């Protein structure tokens, strides 16, 4: 089956509809179903003891395995040819978030550009974990741009990459891994051991997509050479083995600095800067970042479309 064509169908539906509120109220969302399973298993299995890491490994394997097996069973029942591609694309649609990502960051950009800092702080609190009350205009712009860059990889390029590789099991399995990491893959007393496997697996499956995302941002920039140079120089200085690639490419493309120190509700993170000699982002840079995002995602879609065409004629 042409998995790349299936992903193109999913992209098209997502761009046209997003995930409608009426549908969410009626059936929820597949990621929330996965999250409920994780929460239930974590509640029963995450307790102190010398086997805490092993229990976390088993929970991660159970969640990923359950998701992949269900998705594989559904995929095996799809009809052959283009009807199967169309149905598969509809089923993959909930795992794609191009429109949602753009809308969430645009909701920050609108009040920030208008000078409404409280409104921008409220909007950015929906997409980042840091304390918004401490953020000035450059801080809000920086937080939103970092979220846009990192989540373009985690929420868009990575699931589509694995969808192209393995179809429904690939895209659904990736989302299970990413949801595990977002819920239990934290370096806290509660999750350091229990979430160890989830965090490591997430790092592994994002190795290629994160670098591809950085490349898409760099190639979509009018200043390709600078974006590529900043990415190559600074990406590895990020605390994450993967997030630095799209963030550094974004920083180079927009000629701003990203990452750096930030305040969370429970801690202060003193991170190195990406493109540290550049100025802080301004509100207008957030609009430029959204334009870069649109070009990069258009380029990604074109690449997937070309893969689909080559697949169909091979």
From Swiss-Prot:
<keyword id="KW-0812">Transmembrane</keyword>
<feature type="transmembrane region" description="Helical">
    <location>
        <begin position="290"/>
        <end position="310"/>
    </location>
</feature>
<feature type="transmembrane region" description="Helical">
    <location>
        <begin position="3"/>
        <end position="23"/>
    </location>
</feature>
<dbReference type="GO" id="GO:0048472">
    <property type="term" value="F:threonine-phosphate decarboxylase activity"/>
</dbReference>
<keyword id="KW-1133">Transmembrane helix</keyword>
<feature type="transmembrane region" description="Helical">
    <location>
        <begin position="57"/>
        <end position="77"/>
    </location>
</feature>
<feature type="transmembrane region" description="Helical">
    <location>
        <begin position="154"/>
        <end position="174"/>
    </location>
</feature>
<keyword id="KW-0169">Cobalamin biosynthesis</keyword>
<feature type="transmembrane region" description="Helical">
    <location>
        <begin position="78"/>
        <end position="98"/>
    </location>
</feature>
<keyword id="KW-0472">Membrane</keyword>
<dbReference type="Pfam" id="PF03186">
    <property type="entry name" value="CobD_Cbib"/>
</dbReference>
<dbReference type="GO" id="GO:0005886">
    <property type="term" value="C:plasma membrane"/>
</dbReference>
<keyword id="KW-1003">Cell membrane</keyword>
<comment type="similarity">
    <text>Belongs to the CobD/CbiB family.</text>
</comment>
<comment type="pathway">
    <text>Cofactor biosynthesis; adenosylcobalamin biosynthesis.</text>
</comment>
<dbReference type="InterPro" id="IPR004485">
    <property type="entry name" value="Cobalamin_biosynth_CobD/CbiB"/>
</dbReference>
<dbReference type="GO" id="GO:0009236">
    <property type="term" value="P:cobalamin biosynthetic process"/>
</dbReference>
<dbReference type="GO" id="GO:0015420">
    <property type="term" value="F:ABC-type vitamin B12 transporter activity"/>
</dbReference>
<protein>
    <recommendedName>
        <fullName>Cobalamin biosynthesis protein CobD</fullName>
    </recommendedName>
</protein>
<comment type="function">
    <text>Converts cobyric acid to cobinamide by the addition of aminopropanol on the F carboxylic group.</text>
</comment>
